[in-house]
Amino acid sequence: MTLIQHPRDATVFAPGLPRAYDTHRAPWQLPAGKKLAVSVLLHAPSYQDVPPAGSFKPIAMQGGVGRDTAEPKHGQLARLSQWDFGLTVGIWRLLGIAQKAGVPVAVALDSFGVRTMPGLADLVAERAQEIVVRGSAANIILDEAMTADEERAYIAEARSAVEAATGRTASGWFSPERANSARTAGLLREAGFDWFGDWPVDERPVALDGAASGLTAVPFGLETEDMFALYTRSLAFPDYERLLDETVEQLIADADVVGGRFLGLSWFGWVLGQACFADVAERTLTKLAANPQVLLVTPGDVAALHR
Amino acid sequence: MTIQNNDRLVYEAMPTRPLVTWPEGRTVAVWHAPNVEHYDYIAPGGGTPQGRTRYPDPQHYMHRDNGNRTAFWRMLRAVDRFEIPSTVSLSLSVLEEMPEVRDAMAERGWEIMSHGISNLRPLYDMPYDDEDRFYELSQQLAETYYGGRRIKGMLGPKVSGTDNTSDLMVKHGMTYHADWIHDEQPRPLRTEGDGRLVSIPYSFMLNDVPLLLAKHYPGSYFVDMAKAQIDRMLRDADEDGQGRVACIATHPFVSGQPYMQRYLEEIFAYLRSDDRIWVATAADITDHYLENSYDEQLAHANGISAAREARA
């Protein structure tokens, strides 16, 4: 008998997410005495100016003129072309930086991008250590109002397009705008995915249960994400770099107390790939690669390591 | 059939493109785009400069108008000191109604980039014939009041457009469109017919309105961003040989404020400190690209596309 009677229409906890708390769970042991596993996920999403009828779109999203996050009027090209910058220039700058630093990366592609941008998928497949499926387009999202079959079809279409275009098998998923229905994790597992990166819920991977059993939530942090830090929060880029440095330093220190830590760096071609911000990525990855306490690993490998 | 915005882009990833180069071995072209704007006191349709009160909004009308009465002239002193060629993103009503401002720009040889008639008269949903007449009027204004020089490009008023904008710009003799910020180089834009139109990289990154007015960074951050952006482009160009473009977008009512002068001068001094930087106008950059790169870039991108279709 509990004291709280939750309203019938409330879902109090995320389905599939076991409740577990630091200092009350066995520490996560990383190989070779490493203290911090870091995965870099580079987003290469495309923006569909006129989504198909019936698509679900975000209420607000970043990119465009000023700080207005509402959907731009048709005919304004700022958001469309700013997101496209990630595909023409930004993602390649970030891939070059990672390659020079010797850091393995996963690149997340969507079906609209690989269908409409000739050469994008081939070149990413040559340069990325892991391919991740990122839905239909940056601004076509999963939504609770979809039926299960609609959501299954969305997931299947995206996966099929990205795998066909890259010639690579994808074991990981990232939802545009991190938008989910309550069913999403279970449907991703049903579709055969091993991990997904949507949930910034922990500092170590989380094995899900219930319908999503077998799926690992690889937590790509929100506060350390470039779009959230530089756009949503409007941090100045030197402050963002300091935030990253201090996060790494603290996570390594915490590992001695609560066990191995994970840091998922979620970076967008159209954000950190901008020339004015790219040195933050370069310096951060160079420092991480030189840190003997850090294990640099793709998210697919970190999910496998955790299982 | 109207070309959709996504389809206007001629995609090719930067690493596979033929090299784009700039005159005299320079590697980063930088254009200064002062937005000299007029905002109607009471705008057709009732728009306001800031969306703060119902019209009129004297606070922001006056704030912007002061940009042309005082701040513009202060900015000119910095432009003159560093001899910065400028491409004015111009509310074209200024040509007819502010001869002092017009003549100061003309004396310095500033290039006019259309920014509409007023910055509170966007193009959204404008019928084809009305938009057609808008470009006709734009060119008439330039020919009448600016030494017969026709306008070569546009940044849509209030960054607006329609599905017909690119095609109508070509019809009226324009060659560059600044609303696209999808690249560090000009890129071909698909249009109906054989007209050649390119995107010219404008900026909402190195732009005083998003940085200072919308996001409230200090003036010194505008300098930090400009230096970070151009430094990185210079290093990348040294490495891969690709010429790049940066834009410094200013507005008199923002960058012309007294406290901003030192930062504007710091940016201009930086532009003059490195011989690899080509300080040019949007038309200089566009003309050079059309002459030397456009056909090769288009053919190369089309080749990649054709190879993919053949493989499929």
Model-derived segments and their meaning:
Chain B
Residues 2-198, 223-248, 254-312:
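Catalytic alpha-helical scaffold of carbohydrate-active enzymes acting on polysaccharides/glycoconjugates
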Residues 201-234:
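A conserved mid-domain beta-alpha-beta active-site/ligand-binding segment of alpha/beta enzyme cores
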